[in-house]
Structures are given as C-alpha cells and as structure tokens.
C-alpha cells in the first residue's frame, strides 16, 4: 500500500466520483440495491473473461477499480489469484469484509493503478478494468498503466459505455431517471467512450484487440452479449504481444 501519489496520479482521480461510491459502499453486496445492474451483468462479464482466457484457475489476476469486489470475488471463486485495487477506501473495507465472510483470499489494495504498474510491471496474467474508465479524468493513462502491469502474452479486458444519443437515453435518462436502476448522477455522458476512441487508447498501449461485444438488456433473458450491438454498454478483450 502507498500513502503518497504523484501529481499526475492525483490529477487522474475525481474526488466527486470517489465520494459518490464511498457513500454507497455499504450497499455493494445488496443484489436489489443501487448496484443491482452490476449484480445482473457480472455473470455475463465473467463468462466473457473466462472464454477469452481459457479459464481463470491458477492465473494471477488484477482487477482495477474493483469497488466492493463483485468481480474480484467471482474470479477468485474460479480459482484465480486476485489482486483488487481501488481508491475508494470505504468500498475496499466492504470488499475485504465480504471476502473474509466468504472465505476468499483476495489482496485488496488502496493504490493507484499507475503506482502499482510501476511497482509490479509485467506481473499479471489477466487484467480487468470494468465500468471504471468513464469515471476518471484521463482514461488513456489508466489503459497504459493496465497494459504495463500485464505480462507479455496476457489478456486484458475493458468495459465502458459508448457515447451517443442512444447511450444517453438508455444509460442516463432511462437507467437513472425513469427506471431508477442506478442513482441519479452515477454517470456523465461526456465521459462515455466510443469504441473507436478506446481502441486508439489500446493501440497506443501496444495492445492487440481480440473481440468486442455489446452488453445489452433483453427483457426475457436479462443481460446478454451481442457481437453487433455496441451502442450502449460494451466489453473488449485484448492481448499484450509476447515481445
């Protein structure tokens, strides 16, 4: 754990975002609470990750922006050696307590990914950074740091929201104001990231894209993957070249 951060790392933290998630920390593991959509989408995200890693058992995994540990615990249940990092200490306290109650061995750290990547470059078989990029001022720096922490030949996953009229209507108007799936103010549409923009960031980090799928809501099936519809939520799998 570190107690100090560089000026560049401090600039890549939005205090309002940290405060927002800290205030909701106690409700991370309530499947019917403010994080209900993440509980619903988590199995789909996990399946996508497992499919593109040939399983997680025995792999060293870094979960960036782990929050209360929903994905971290799910990956640990699959036999992964998980390190979860986040800058919302209240969320990490909840994650640690839940892991203890569940009997899961997960290394949760309150540390910036930029710092961790400097300390442990090329150390992880798999890196995940899901629903986090749209909450930071400089997502490109996060992508670069995640890639730095990944071993050559390792797999890396990002998920976020596309930026267009449809994502504004569904991701903000409907989800926050009409259906109440997530608290009002959870997202800022201007911070949503188009797939083409994310791919430019991953290209700059020397990552090779493998697959991109949309995460869409089906009234009958719940959240499902789509190879064609990336208009709102989407997830991307990439690989770090061997050399």
Curated annotation (Swiss-Prot):
Gene3D superfamilies: Vaccinia Virus protein VP39. GO terms for biological process: methylation. SUPFAM superfamilies: S-adenosyl-L-methionine-dependent methyltransferases (SSF53335). InterPro entries: Methyltransf_11, SAM-dependent_MTases_sf, UbiG_MeTrfase. It catalyses: a 3-demethylubiquinol + S-adenosyl-L-methionine = a ubiquinol + S-adenosyl-L-homocysteine + H(+); a 3-(all-trans-polyprenyl)benzene-1,2-diol + S-adenosyl-L-methionine = a 2-methoxy-6-(all-trans-polyprenyl)phenol + S-adenosyl-L-homocysteine + H(+). Pfam families: Methyltransf_11. S-adenosyl-L-methionine binds at residues 45, 65, 86, 130. Belongs to the methyltransferase superfamily. UbiG/COQ3 family. O-methyltransferase that catalyzes the 2 O-methylation steps in the ubiquinone biosynthetic pathway. This is Ubiquinone biosynthesis O-methyltransferase. The gene is ubiG.
